[in-house]
Amino acid sequence: MLLFFCYLIDLTDAKLGKNSINTSFVSGYGTTYPRQIHHRIAEVNQVILKGALVGGPDGNIESDLPPAKKYWDDSSMYSTNEVAIYYNSPLVFVLSAFQ
């Protein structure tokens, strides 16, 4: 159980900015975070949807960069910057365990 808990901490740290590009994938969290998320309401109103988790790096994007660095803060890049319930609900579940 302790090993699993440590694994969850590492995964959460990676989403919050302890990763190869030093970027938080939760908008509004940290100093470097997604500002151009793929979310229709946020795009139209030009607001930062604080607390939303985006997908992060996409190893399938054609680039010379290593897979963990294939991330662009661009609202047209839905594979890296989309806000989806299947990203955000597990994050809420894991963070609730850290109380």
Task: Locate each region found by the language model.
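Aromatic (Trp/Tyr) and acidic
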Residues: 1-99
